[in-house]
Amino acid sequence: FCSAFLGYEKGIHAPGIADLGAGRRAAHHLLLAHGLALRVLNINSPDSLNGLVLNMSPTYPKSDCARDIEAAQLADDFLFQWYAQPVLAGSYPDKAMAHIPEHLRPPIETGDMAIISQPMDYIGLNYYTRGIFHAEADNAFVETVPTEAELTDMGWEVFPQGLTDLLVNLHKRYSLPPVFITENGVAMADKVVNG
């Protein structure tokens, strides 16, 4: 997510490219590299535990209106399930793929999805906050930052219930290997004491 989406699609991280097609191609090739690495690790270190760590946030609609509910579901598929579904179910989410113009979709070769979706010994999840989304005329989904909630110094909502919701939703959607919470918490202004 960080290198593909933030680096190639949004241009926030290195290499600073803001291009939907480049981001989706980078994501596909990262997932393909993961699958190829699993093969090598399983052959050369058969007793090791091998898996993948994903950044994920549950998505919620801003309101109960059908368009906002649909926007939140598309945001989940487009931002998070795009990385989870290939490794856990062997395909990209249909709604997310349909949201990408055909000429910007990643080139998926015969056999790619089988490589990507090899069984893993575990999956790691990095969770920090939830995403709240609504629909707008020009955009399928737009993220809303809640103004009434407690926010971290990074502007992320403090929302512990989101971790439970994320785990429950993933369990309903996929047959999961063992799950590890590999990152979570909040970023706040720390004071250095005696240091």
What are these regions (language model features)?
Residues 1-195:
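Active-site region of glycoside hydrolase catalytic domains
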